[in-house]
Amino acid sequence: MLDAAVQMFSVNGYHETSMDAIAAEAEISKPMLYLYYGSKEELFGAVLNRELSRFVDAVRGDIDFTLSPKDLLRNAVVSYLSYIDANRASWIVLYTQATSSQTFSHTVREGREKIVDLVARLLQSGTRNPQPDTDFDMMAVALVGAGEAVANSVSTGDADVHDAAQLMINLFWGGLKGKPSDTQTHPATTA
């Protein structure tokens, strides 16, 4: 039932999808659908909770903090975009349909906060010489926002997952390297 709902919501949107259409897609009766979920709103909430959990669990499960910082970044980005590429309907429901609804945007926001927290921890673990005022949380917000924009292109088929991953890795790694610490040697300057 939830798989059918994901497909229908991703194609038609929340407001245009009927319980009749979801029941037909799931090959069950409409009363059976109402028996399990009560209303379209409850069904959509169940879809969001399941899809967010699957997404966060999949990305978290592919993170290995024992890797080098660059390999950790590569692994996280490839995992993130590969999941979206393999679950396009889910992404469309989560980040297009759900975010356009006041009723459900808080659920997506909670999922995004979990990803931002994970990215902030990745940044902290991979930073050798952080500046005292480094705001890993704000950096994570920026990276997740950029990642969502790229993910939207992947989910619509406008971007190849491997090309998009390489672009994100190059962009993020160049920015994350930061400036050298004061203890590293600097080229001699002449006055």
Task: Describe the function of each predicted region.
Residues 46, 57-86, 139, 143, ...:
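Hydrophobic alpha-helical connector segments
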Residues 71, 75, 81-120, 152, ...:
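Short secondary-structure transition hinges
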Residues 92-95, 132, 183-185:
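Short, hydrophobic secondary-structure boundary micro-motifs
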Residues 53-56, 102-128, 137-141, 163-166:
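Amphipathic alpha-helical packing segments from all-alpha helical-bundle domains
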